[in-house]
A protein has these predicted regions:
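Flexible cytoplasmic inter-helical loops of multi-pass small-molecule transporters
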Residues: 221-247, 441-450
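Extracytoplasmic gate region of multi-pass secondary transporters
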Residues: 37-41, 255-309, 369, 399
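C-terminal transmembrane helical hairpin of 12-TM major facilitator-type secondary transporters
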Residues: 322-368
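Helix-to-loop junctions at the C-terminal end of transmembrane segments
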Residues: 70-84, 309-321
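Helix-loop-helix hairpin linking two adjacent transmembrane segments in secondary transporters
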Residues: 172-227
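C-terminal ends and interior cores of transmembrane alpha-helices
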Residues: 93-126, 331-345
Length: 452
């Protein structure tokens, strides 16, 4: 007698990679919206009257509810209780709502004649009403995008378990970063598309809001595929996953290795995403470039990361060395930020530093996210990702404000870049510590994901 081997939908190469493209599409458009105003910070100052500090506070608002209302923790609980289909659709809908509020805030529809405008202008007068309402929208959007990031990570872990997980996560990150490249190129162009003499921040935000709707539709299509996979696998796997208890979160905060990973994450990403918000302005200031050219120069950063991350993910799947990759990524980031801080800048040096940062931004995420399932049980993997994202959000909220203040106080970018470099040094220390812990306890961070 021959034994029948049951095939599932995710055993199909075409099906699991189609699923990846669908969930990654939502993150592609989400990342576009996150940075749609990053190349236009100087335009916000000239058309909306925002200062650098106002802009930094606005950027930080994306993370406010995630940090202080503990929304990300709740998002992880929702994910572990309700599953990836419900949580993914919810996150996409929340992003669209937040984006729509932000769009209204910066449009001419939100005028000084409105009662809401006058109310928002009645307090904290140094922060314009447009910035206040845009920040509210960005807060809501931030809840959705972080929930989406956690959900997509768990979805990939489910569809690619025992397969090309690191490669899949690397490709998802690559597609998302292509969104950053696209918006740094597209946003300055869209700002002048209707009237070159009167650039506006409204058109880029409108286009990216529409794209968020398309991303939500793509995820809804994925949910039909996931429903079929669940029906094939039966209830056993899902039931095991649903045995999550809220008390399991306490295990994360008592795990030294998990906290090292979370600390490394917040330090590293706090030197990446806040820098991304100010990079165009830095290149404009230090190289004397117009906005479009400065944004175009920096747009090569996500492209470098996009190209390399899948290859590094494949290397991690087959050869391992995850902890070593984290250390190398932190080193390269330190070199990049010190270059911008201490070396007289030319376009050649700027390209070199940006490419270096792109390589760094390939190494760390490619190794970091696939390592988490090696440290925690599947039943609270969603909560583990949420806790990491929550801790990360604390840094992502704090450092745009710190950098904006440093810019207003010093009038230059040397101090901000030294702040970013110091974060890289601390991340390097934690990377070395993590490698020691892995060697001592045998977590398998240096081992390949695909077992032969």
């Amino acid at each position: 007698m021959t034994q029948t081997i049951k095939k599932y939908l995710n055993d199909s190469f075409a099906a699991r990679w189609t699923a990846l493209v669908l969930v990654a599409s939502m993150m592609f458009f989400a990342y576009m919206f996150v940075d749609v105003l990053s190349p236009l910070s100087t335009l916000l100052e000239s058309t909306k009257g925002w200062t650098a500090e106002n802009y930094g506070t606005f950027c930080s608002s994306e993370y406010f509810l995630n940090v202080f209302a503990f929304f990300l923790i709740f998002a992880g609980i929702i994910l572990d209780k309700m599953g990836i289909r419900f949580t993914g659709i919810l996150s996409g809908a929340v992003m669209v709502v937040g984006a729509s509020i932000k769009l209204f805030a910066i449009s001419d529809l939100f005028s000084p004649e409105s009662g809401l405008y006058n109310f928002l202008n009645s307090f904290w007068t140094s922060f314009p009403p447009t910035a206040k309402l845009a920040s509210v929208g960005f807060m809501i959007f931030g809840c959705g995008v972080e929930m989406a990031g956690v959900t997509v990570s768990k979805a990939i872990a489910r569809w690619f378990k025992g397969k090309e997980m690191a490669l899949a996560m690397g490709l998802e990150m690559a597609i998302a970063r292509l969104g950053v490249f696209a918006v740094f190129r597209l946003s300055p162009y869209l700002s002048t598309a209707l009237n070159e003499a009167m650039p506006t921040v409204v058109t880029p935000v409108l286009v990216c809001t529409i794209l968020l709707l398309i991303g939500l539709i793509a995820y809804i299509v994925f949910t039909f595929m996931d429903k079929k996979l669940e029906s094939q696998q039966g209830a056993a796997d899902e039931e095991a996953e649903e045995q999550f208890k809220v008390s399991d979160i306490g295990k994360l905060f008592t795990s030294k290795t998990f906290l090292i990973v979370a600390g490394l994450c917040v330090l590293y990403y706090s030197a990446i995403f806040p820098f991304q918000k100010f990079a165009t302005g830095m290149l404009e200031s230090n190289l004397g470039l117009p906005t479009e050219k400065a944004a175009g120069l920096f747009s090569w950063f996500p492209i470098g990361a996009m190209v390399l991350t899948p290859f590094l993910g494949a290397f991690l799947d087959n050869k391992g060395k995850g902890a070593t990759m984290l250390i190398c990524g932190a080193l390269l980031m330190i070199v990049c930020h010190l270059t911008f801080a201490l070396i007289p800048l030319t376009k050649t040096i700027a390209y070199f530093a940006i490419i270096l940062l792109g390589v760094s931004f390939s190494l760390v995420p490619a190794a970091l996210w696939p390592s988490v399932p090696k440290l925690v049980e599947d039943r609270y993997l969603g909560s583990a990702y949420s806790v990491i994202f929550w801790i990360q959000n604390i840094g992502l909220m704090a450092f745009p404000i710190i950098i904006g203040l440093a810019l207003d106080k010093t009038g230059g970018y040397t101090v901000p870049m030294l702040i970013f470099a110091s974060l890289g040094i601390l991340a390097l220390v934690l990377g070395l510590w993590l490698k020691v812990e892995d060697k001592k306890n045998g977590y398998g961070l240096e081992e390949p994901n695909i077992k032969k």
